[in-house]
Amino acid sequence: MVEKVPMTQNGFVKLQEELRWRQQEERPRIIEAISEARAHGDLSENAEYHAAKEAQSHNEGRIGELEDLTARAEVIDLTKMSGSKIKFGAKVKLIDEDTEEEKSYQIVGDQEADVKAGRISISSPIARALIGKEVGDSIEVNAPGGAKAYEILSISWG
């Protein structure tokens, strides 16, 4: 059975845009670079040719990965999400119980995660600790710098 990959509509659109760019713009550009480098003669010591072939390999690998991800995508409609328990798509405001620092995160798919932008992967330790919890609950997360305790201040959707 094919394992579905949960993601938001935004995340799915970004993957589709990258796939289109790699197939329709980057692939032809690389093919042209290979053709130009090939015209320079001896391929055994042609750095431009080898660089272009390496770029082609990387691009084709990423195209395969993107095709797989978009085929297995399970797009979650965040506008239909609600409830008092944290699940995929939730926007959560936490307070560090030691430093009193507030943090806000949205739980998203692995491909969409960007901690600096406040989006954490559903498979991250903090998201796994948050799933199923409610406002007022406390969680403990084992972080690289040691265990951190947070209290959940709010949950929102969309």
UniProtKB/Swiss-Prot annotation:
The lineage of its organism: Bacteria, Pseudomonadati, Pseudomonadota, Alphaproteobacteria, Hyphomicrobiales. Gene3D superfamilies: Transcription elongation factor, GreA/GreB, C-terminal domain, Transcription elongation factor, GreA/GreB, N-terminal domain. Pfam families: GreA_GreB, GreA_GreB_N. This is Transcription elongation factor GreA. Keywords: DNA-binding, Transcription, Transcription regulation. Necessary for efficient RNA polymerase transcription elongation past template-encoded arresting sites. The arresting sites in DNA have the property of trapping a certain fraction of elongating RNA polymerases that pass through, resulting in locked ternary complexes. Cleavage of the nascent transcript by cleavage factors such as GreA or GreB allows the resumption of elongation from the new 3'terminus. GreA releases sequences of 2 to 3 nucleotides. It comes from the Bacteria. The gene is greA. One of its GO terms (molecular function) is RNA polymerase binding. GO terms for biological process: DNA-templated transcription elongation; regulation of DNA-templated transcription elongation. PANTHER family: TRANSCRIPTION ELONGATION FACTOR GREA.
